Amino acid sequence: MSLIVDASVAVKWVADEENSSRARALYLADDCMAPDLIIAEVGNAMWKKQRRNLVTAEQMKAAMLALPERLHLFDIAELAQRAAEIAIKLDHPIYDCFYLALAERERCALVSADAKLLAAAKKVKGIEARKL
């Protein structure tokens, strides 16, 4: 099954957090897709964890290598116009709206651990949102 995952899910693939085991099960079982923005978002989250000594520098670098290998990535330039439309309509940060635009376009469920993103997804017709 193809799913759109956001950074809140992908970080759990590479760092031990609440529901990491559920996120890793998705990683192993499903075809996961995301806008390429996810690399920067996960990188920033891992950098913050590395600064707080929650992960090592090696773990951070390994995460950056693993993401493009495991995820089917989509260029955000292709999603930008629709993401902007959604952001304006919902008054929601455009970062999240790239995931919504991709879920809408690909007709795939969006999986997230982010309550605000899931709430926004419910406001876009045709998007199935699933809490991790």
Set out the residue ranges of the language-model regions.
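N-terminal active-site wall of soluble small-molecule enzyme domains
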Residues: 97
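Short, well-structured N-terminal submotif of metal-dependent ribonuclease cores
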Residues: 1-37, 49-61, 125
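Acidic, PIN/NYN-like endoribonuclease modules and their adjacent C-terminal/linker elements
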Residues: 1-2, 35, 92, 100-132
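Acidic catalytic patch
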Residues: 36-37, 59-89, 101
